[in-house]
Design a protein with these regions (language model features):
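Cyclophilin-like peptidyl-prolyl cis-trans isomerases
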Residues: 1-198
Length: 198
């Protein structure tokens, strides 16, 4: 368990705005420092505000965070982290911003348990940018462990994640009615006293 965590609130709307709710996420900077820094920067930049969850699969996960294209083909890291679409042999000057990615931290011992947040990427290593996915309460996709990086957990509102995972979808697992991430807000950091870990 991490001694210091960062708290982010996601305001969500789905079913044509008929349903709404807040999902609170506790990020783990000790376990996944680069993922947390990147996610926090994207939140603080307002990049996630007004985006959609473009890929929703019941009993599995809901995926969003493509703030450039809104369909899973776009998004990128908040700043230069040394990787250009997974390649760390390219200089920042030779990499377009829309190809900025972050290194995997998937060996951090955190598993894809219900109500966790993990980073989306291609099948190639170190290709996470801004897309992320939330795991509903009825899903434990263990085959992602050690491949995708878990960097936090949903501490409140996982019922909303689970409800959204069951919405009607069309081609490419895209919801028929938009599932909107209205706003993402960095609430602050919390430090837990050491004795809570014993």
């Amino acid at each position: 368990a991490d001694t210091t965590t960062d708290i982010v609130d996601l305001q969500l709307k789905w079913n044509g705005g008929a349903n709404s709710g807040t999902v609170t996420i506790e990020l783990y900077p000790d376990s996944a420092p680069i993922h947390v820094e990147n996610f926090k920067l994207l939140v603080q930049n307002g990049d996630y505000d007004g985006t959609v969850f473009h890929r929703v699969i019941d009993d599995f996960m809901i995926q969003g965070g493509d703030f450039t294209n809104g369909d899973g083909t776009g998004g990128h890291a908040a700043k230069w982290f040394g990787y250009c679409n997974g390649d760390n042999g390219v200089s920042e000057a030779d990499c377009q911003q829309d190809r900025y990615t972050i290194p995997d931290e998937a060996d951090n011992g955190l598993d894809h348990e219900p109500c966790t947040i993990s980073m989306a990427k291609t099948s190639a290593p170190h290709t996470g940018g801004s897309q992320f996915f939330l795991i509903p309460s009825d899903s434990t996709p263990t085959w992602l462990d050690g491949v995708h990086t878990v960097f936090g957990e949903v501490t409140s509102g996982c019922n909303h994640v689970t409800a959204i995972s069951g919405v009607e979808t069309g081609s490419n697992d895209r919801p028929v009615q938009n599932v909107e991430l209205v706003s993402a807000t960095f609430v602050g950091s919390e430090t837990k006293p050491w004795y809570e870990f014993w």
